[in-house]
Amino acid sequence: MSQITLPAFHMPFQSAGCHPGLAETREAAWEWAAAEGLDLSVPARRKMIRTRPELWISLIFPQATQAHLDLFCQWLFWAFLVDDEFDDGPAGRDPLMCERAIARLVDVFDGAAPNGPMERALAGLRDRTCRGRSPQWNRQFRRDTAAWLWTYYAEAVERAAGQVPSRAEFAKHRRDSVAMQPFLCLHEITAGIDLPDSARSLPAYIALRNAVTDHSGLCNDICSFEKEAALGYEHNAVRLIQRDRGSTLQEAVDEAGIQLARIAERVQRAERELIEEIEAAGIDGPTRTALERCVRDYRGLVRGDFDYHARAERYTRPDLVELDERDSLSRHFAA
C-alpha cells in the first residue's frame, strides 16, 4: 500500500498518442533478448515485464517506423537490464566490480571485441544504430551513452564512502543518469534529421534538451521513490529534499511536484528562446526545419514519458519489490 499521495501534476503538453505497433515491438524485444543470450533470472524477468519498455518507447515515438521502434525498444530493454544490475544488484555495491564492468561496456561501444551476452548485445545495437550516421551525431550519442554508464560508478563509489550528494550536485548528475539524452539522439533517426554542431551549440537548444531531460529525471524520482526507498537507494531527488528540509515524505513529494511544474515551464521557455535564436542567427533550410521538428516532438516526448510513469507497474506497484532476491538480478556483471 502506498504511503504517499501523488500531487496533481501540471502537464501543459498534449499526448501525441501511442504507437500501434506496441505489441509487435514487445514480442520483438523478448525474441531479441533470447537470441542475444540475455538469460534473465526469474525475478529479473518479472521486473522487466512490470517495466514494459515497449510502452515507454511507443509513447515516446508514436510515429516511428516499426523497424525503428523495435531497435529503440531493444536499446531500452538493454538499458533497463543495466539499470537493474547496478541499482539493485551486487555490481552496484562494489566499486571495483562496477568500474570494471562499466569500462568494458564503454570500450565495447568504442569498438573493442565484446565478451559475454551484455557486451555482444551492446555491440550489435551500436552497429545497427550508428551505421550511416554523421560524425557529429555519433559524437553526441557516444558522449551521452558513456556519460550515462559512468553515473553508475559514481553512485557505487558514493554508496561505499557513505556519501550523499547535495541537491545541486544530484541535479547535474541526474541529467546524465536518467539516460534520456541518448534517446534524444535516437529521436533524430526516426525524425529523419541530423543536427549540425552549430545547432547543437545553440544555448536555447541546450537548455531545451536539459529541461526535457530534467523533467524525465524528476518524474522518475517521484514515481520510483517508494521502490527505491525499500532498497535503501539514496540517489533520488525526493529523498534528498526530505533529508535537506527535514520534511515528511508527503511534503517532499509535494515539493518535488512543484519543481516538476517549474521544469515544464523551462521547456516552454526554451522553446520560445530557441525560435528567437533561430531568427537571430539567420538559420534556415534543413537546419531550421530540424530544430523546429525538435521543438514540436520534444513536447510529445515529455508527455509520453510522463504518461508512462503513471502506467507501468515498475512505478505504480512499489509493493512488488523483491527484497530477498536482489542478488539474483546480477548475472552479467557480478560473476
From Swiss-Prot:
Catalytic reaction equation(s): (2E,6E)-farnesyl diphosphate = (+)-(E)-beta-caryophyllene + diphosphate; (+)-(E)-beta-caryophyllene + H2O = (+)-caryolan-1-ol
Cofactor: binding details: Binds 3 Mg(2+) ions per subunit. To a lesser extent, can also use Mn(2+) instead of Mg(2+). Cannot use Fe(2+), Co(2+), Zn(2+), Ni(2+), or Cu(2+).
Inducers of expression: Expressed under the control of A-factor (2-isocapryloyl-3R-hydroxymethyl-gamma-butyrolactone), in an AdpA-dependent manner.
Motif NSE/DTE motif: chain residues: 220-228
Origin: domain of life: Bacteria
EC number from the UniProt entry: 4.2.1.138, 4.2.3.89
Entry binding sites for Mg(2+) 3: N220, S224, E228
Gene Ontology terms describing biological process: sesquiterpene biosynthetic process; sesquiterpenoid biosynthetic process
Coiled coil: none
Phenotype of gene-disrupted mutants: Cells lacking this gene do not produce (+)-caryolan-1-ol.
Temperature dependence of activity: Optimum temperature is 30 degrees Celsius for (+)-caryolan-1-ol synthesis.
Cell inner membrane is among the record's keywords: no
Biological pathway: Secondary metabolite biosynthesis; terpenoid biosynthesis
Disulfide pairings: none
Cofactor dependence: Mg(2+); Mn(2+)
Keyword terms of this UniProt record: Hydrolase, Lyase, Magnesium, Manganese, Metal-binding
Sample GO molecular function, one term: manganese ion binding
Entry binding sites for Mg(2+) 1: D83, D87
Motif (DDXXD motif): 83-87
Domain comment in the entry: The Asp-Asp-Xaa-Xaa-Asp/Glu (DDXXD/E) motif is important for the catalytic activity, presumably through binding to Mg(2+).
Record family assignment: Belongs to the terpene synthase family.
Role, per record: Sesquiterpene cyclase that first catalyzes the cyclization of farnesyl diphosphate (FPP) to the bicyclic sesquiterpene (+)-beta-caryophyllene intermediate, and then its conversion to (+)-caryolan-1-ol via a second cyclization and the addition of a water molecule.
Protein name (Swiss-Prot/TrEMBL): (+)-caryolan-1-ol synthase
Organism of derivation: Streptomyces griseus subsp. griseus (strain JCM 4626 / CBS 651.72 / NBRC 13350 / KCC S-0626 / ISP 5235)
